[in-house]
Swiss-Prot record:
Protein's UniProt name: Uronate isomerase
InterPro entries: Metal_Hydrolase, Uronate_isomerase
Gene Ontology biological process terms, A to Z: D-galacturonate catabolic process; D-glucuronate catabolic process
Keywords: Isomerase
EC identifiers of the protein: 5.3.1.12
Gene3D superfamilies documented for this protein: Metal-dependent hydrolases (3.20.20.140), uronate isomerase, domain 2, chain A (1.10.2020.10)
NCBIfam families (alphabetical): PRK02925.1
GO MF, any single term: glucuronate isomerase activity
The keyword Isomerase belongs to this UniProt entry's keyword annotation: yes
Family, per entry: Belongs to the metallo-dependent hydrolases superfamily. Uronate isomerase family.
Stored SUPFAM superfamilies: Metallo-dependent hydrolases
Catalytic activity: D-glucuronate = D-fructuronate; aldehydo-D-galacturonate = keto-D-tagaturonate
Amino acid sequence: MVALTDPDLLFPPEAHSRSLARDLYAGIKDLPIVSPHGHTDPRWYALNEPFPDPAQLLIVPDHYIFRMLFSQGVRLEDLGVASLDGAPVETDGRTIWRRFAEHYYLFRGTPTRLWFDHVLAHLFGIEEPLDATTADRHYDTIATVLQWENFRPRALFERFNIEVIATTEGALDDLEWHKMIRDSGWEGRVVTAYRPDAVVDPDFEGFSANLDRLGEITGCDTGSWAGYLDAHRQRRAFFKSFGATSSDHGHPTAETANLSDAAAQELFNRIRRGSQDERERKLFRAQMLTEMAKMSRDDGLVLQIHPGSWRNHSPSVFQRFGRDKGFDIPTRTDYVTALKPLLDCVGLERDLTVILFTLDESSYARELAPLAGVYPALKLGPAWWFHDSPEGMRRFREMTTETAGFYNTVGFNDDTRAFPSIPARHDVARRVDCAFLARLVAEHRLREDEAHELARELAHTLAKKAYRL
């Protein structure tokens, strides 16, 4: 597979710049992986059991894959995606794999193709392209090695040279898998992150019951504003005891508010009573982002804001299959106006880190880079989700560096559920950054020694610093 094994993958076609990119990449390609934000399952590392069949490992959990197939008429149930009503779905891994292989051509030119080919070649030693004619052969190869000890989760963690990985758990999670990891004596560093969406977003399903549960597990009165905030503080401390260095917030917008305590208390009371006023529900989410930022100022958790996704765009798919089924769509997102209440409150705090992400690329140069380029509390997260492709990463660097520089960004995070693809995702990011730095050197805008230093920072150091790992 020349596209994957070629040493010049994603490097500039011009000879001088390509040579520079090669040298930069050679200096960083084997650096440890810092994965400060993602969605791998801590159960894997806790139990360290063999992964299931190839389809359950590589296809069924990956919405990058099944959303593309669904767009071309393949039913989710035919890909093994479980329905909420318990209706029958395909359970035979080989059948699912064959269906995927028959449609693999759909991924030509996409980052998913790059990542998946990398996994086939570098993890499983497969050199033949995947298609209908090779599907069974590849399935058998992968199914066989998945039973080997050196393909269990902890062994792969070590083989991937992962220095630290963060999972993401909801505020109500008991973190039993993280406790099991800690008690096992295994030295792999797996930390959690605090994701309170289910107890800060009134539109989240079961919100009122979630707040009741939050009160039960903390002993706080979540019927009162003060007790509700205390419950968050207690849960954040609990998550920190299992290594958390960050919280994560997936709000529909970046809107924030900074109400007086009396106004916030009254708003909370109305929300707790089940207010259906959309303006009040939006205002509550906005206020809670600011409250979370103030808590981060006090307890040191890095605050990540992932706004601008219209979640569950298809109500029929959501009702049948639930969340995270490929129907989250980017929207236009305002930051300058939306974040001002939060920034007025804590934006000048030098010991606070708020990492901003976007699905709206038009905001890079107009809003995000100028904001992060002046407010001490702000940093820019890397190209995210729909934009963590080679083209998206290039656009990110080109549109933010001139105003925010490199050191107001946080390196790379893979933000994935697909554990086997983590080395591929980091490799693509490292190659893209080396190509970008090589261009700056070739244009005499950067010295070569500076480019080597920056390559290491972007691949490893900036993520460790920003996420306090």
